[in-house]
Structures are given as structure tokens and as C-alpha cells.
Regions:
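Conserved short alpha-helix immediately C-terminal to the canonical SAM/SAH-binding motif I
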Residues: 50, 75-78
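Short secondary-structure junction/hinge motifs that connect adjacent elements
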Residues: 1-5
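Conserved catalytic-core motifs of GNAT/GCN5-like acyltransferases
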Residues: 68-70, 80, 85-100
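A conserved beta-turn-beta hairpin within the catalytic core of GNAT-like acetyltransferases
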Residues: 23-32, 42, 61-65, 95-98
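Conserved acetyl-CoA-binding loop-helix of GNAT-fold acetyltransferases
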Residues: 37, 43-56
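Residue-level recognition of the GNAT/N-acetyltransferase active site
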Residues: 38, 72
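Conserved beta-strand in the GNAT
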Residues: 7, 13-22, 29-31, 36
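Conserved GNAT acetyl-CoA-binding A-motif
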Residues: 51, 58-71
Length: 104
């Protein structure tokens, strides 16, 4: 699998990161995974900027706007605000409640 990496840096330190995958690598749709923002940077809204950059990278690199991700349940509203909608049932991944979400 070949991921593209979206990296956010501040003062030469990585503070935000995602991996993006072309359609068919994980899901039928393009996908975003491993969304991480350093704890001390979360209040600065870098998660929103990181996701916007990741969505844009998928649209440019893979020429699609249909994107799927596996979200931790407590972040459902965050992803809703970015245009993602729930698909399927809640499930556990590593003991943490998750939900599938798609953006069209």
C-alpha cells in the first residue's frame, strides 16, 4: 500500500499528520487515516486545517471527492462539520468505539 502523507509542521516540528489512500487501498472510496494532532496544538484548530488539506490532497491526487474514514465515535461531530456522514453501525477497534463515515 502506498500512502501519501499530509504533514503539518510548526517551527520545524511535526504537530499534525494524516495518511491518505487512493480508492481501493482500504475502502472502495479514497480514505484518510491516522489523523493525529499534538495534544498541545489541538486548541489551535489544526485538526480542521489538517483535514481540509487532506481532503484537498485527495481531490487533486486521486480526482475524487468521495472519501471514507473510520472515526472514533467521540469525534463524530468534528467530522460532520467537515461534511462526513455516518455509514454503517458503530464498532470497536482496539477497544475504542468507532463509526464509518463518508464524504461525497
Amino acid at each position: 500500500q502506498n500512502a501519501l502523507h499530509v504533514i503539518g509542521k510548526k517551527e520545524n516540528t511535526i504537530i499534525a499528520y494524516t495518511r491518505i489512500f487512493k480508492p481501493g487501498d482500504y475502502f472502495k472510496e479514497a480514505s484518510i487515516g491516522r489523523v493525529v494532532v499534538s495534544e498541545k496544538s489541538r486548541h489551535l484548530k489544526y485538526g480542521h486545517l489538517l483535514m481540509k488539506a487532506s481532503i484537498n490532497a485527495i481531490e487533486i491526487s486521486f480526482r475524487t471527492n468521495k472519501i471514507k474514514l473510520s472515526a472514533q465515535k467521540y469525534l463524530e461531530k468534528f467530522y460532520n462539520n467537515l461534511g462526513f456522514k455516518i455509514v454503517g453501525e458503530e464498532y470497536l477497534e482496539d477497544g475504542i468505539p468507532h463509526i464509518g463515515m463518508i464524504k461525497n
